[in-house]
Amino acid sequence: MNQHMKNDEFAVLYRTNSQSRAIEDALRKKNIDYKIYGGISFYQRKEIKDLLSYLRMLINPNVEEALKRIINYPAWGIGATTIDKLTIAANHYNKSIFKIIKNLDKIDLKINSGTKNKLQNFLNMILRFQIDAQKLNAFEIADLVVKQTQLVKDLEKDGTPEAVSKVENVQEL
């Protein structure tokens, strides 16, 4: 078996989606490109992207993609119209959406007081997480984010086997 074979001549089969993370991590560690057929990559699953977006916000709150993903998940009552207004203001003032939220009292966005309170609560939560992240390790801060945002509770409310799988994915991460 001294033949040198190309990576695209190999396949890795696994029985359950929960096994994909270990395989993906090993391949990533070795810088081996891979494709998932018939399933979704562990890191492409919605619940994983949501949690990673929260964690990205702790490192860099100006990442628009992460902020837009989590600003209303779980449901904070911040709708698409509000997000559009924030995006327009961010473009107008050449600031990030996060900076617009931080300076909401200085900008007239025609947002009602209830929505302003929800945005303030969201901002305060992210700022608290950033402070906590300074003294906690990665596992502890991820656990805190999951508990305080009630991500798992939101996933569990479906009560379906898919919901159980999603909760397991979050716990795996």
What residue ranges belong to the model's regions?
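Coupling/hinge elements of helicase-like and P-loop NTPase modules
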Residues: 1-9, 94-106
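Conserved motor-region signature of P-loop NTPase helicases/translocases
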Residues: 1-68, 155-165
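Phosphate/pyrophosphate-binding and catalytic-coupling "lid/hinge/switch" segments at subdomain interfaces
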Residues: 41, 75-76
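A short secondary-structure junction motif
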Residues: 58, 93, 97, 148-152
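Accessory C-terminal helicase-associated subdomains
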Residues: 74, 104-173
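C-terminal helical "lid" of AAA+/P-loop NTPase domains
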Residues: 84-89
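Proline-centered turn/helix-capping motifs that create local helix->coil transitions or kinks
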Residues: 91-98, 134-138
